[in-house]
Amino acid sequence: MKLHYYPETDSLYIEFKPVPGAETREVADGLVVDLDERGEVVGFDIDLASKRFDLSTLETVALPLHTTTAA
């Protein structure tokens, strides 16, 4: 799973699978789900993310994590 933040559009993309979406559905105002060809969730796109959430912190609970840092 990867989190991508795009400040130019203030959108947060939560990627569950590294495959392209075949279909998108807006499931709520400003929340789009991407589905693969089998209808499985690939990721979520959240518009106006910084206005909806505090993006300055990220907390995980009981997840087996492998951390990487962006260059």
Language-model-derived ranges and their functions:
Residues 7, 11-20, 63-65, 69:
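N-terminal intrinsically disordered, cationic/polar leader segments
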Residues 43-71:
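C-terminal structural segments of small proteins and small subunits
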Residues 11-50:
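Amphipathic, hydrophobic secondary-structure cores in small proteins
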Residues 4-5, 34:
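Hydrophobic beta-strand positions
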